[in-house]
A protein has these predicted regions:
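Polar/charged alpha-helical tracts
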Residues: 5, 23, 67, 100-107
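Compositionally biased, intrinsically disordered low-complexity regions
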Residues: 13-14, 33, 98
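Amphipathic, charge-rich alpha-helical segments that serve as recognition/docking helices
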Residues: 36-42, 85, 89-108
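N-terminal leader/domain-start detector
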Residues: 1-23
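Short alpha-helix boundary/capping and kink motifs at helix termini
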Residues: 17-71, 75-81, 88
């Protein structure tokens, strides 16, 4: 597991700026592998906002590496895993590189 402080905060804009190749996919939640060892706590209002975005399908896609290791979006993933009824697909941006390579790119 990787510490939250070692994982960069990513979105499509950052990926484009860093010229990191990615593609938009819909995948099953079970195909995603979380790699972050710790989470920042968040209050009920923050949880409700994220939950609402997930239910309305307006959430930012989760960011996964080439092997579906979750790089960004662990709180959203935690909420998605607790949904009842379960979600059958999740929006992701899949990178064409590994999470180790991503970490190295952002250390520079």
């Amino acid at each position: 597991m990787i510490s939250r402080s070692d994982l960069p905060q990513l979105n499509a804009t950052v990926l484009h700026e860093k010229r990191i190749p990615y593609e938009y996919l819909k995948v099953t939640p079970n195909s995603i592998k979380p790699i972050q060892s710790d989470r920042l706590p968040f209050d009920d209002n923050h949880y409700i906002r994220r939950y609402t975005k997930i239910v309305r399908d307006t959430y930012n896609p989760l960011i996964v590496d080439k092997d579906f290791n979750l790089i960004d979006g662990h709180h959203r993933y935690d909420i998605i895993r607790r949904m009842d009824p379960p979600m059958t697909s999740v929006r992701v941006l899949q990178l064409g590189i590994s999470y180790e390579t991503v970490i190295e790119l952002f250390k520079k």
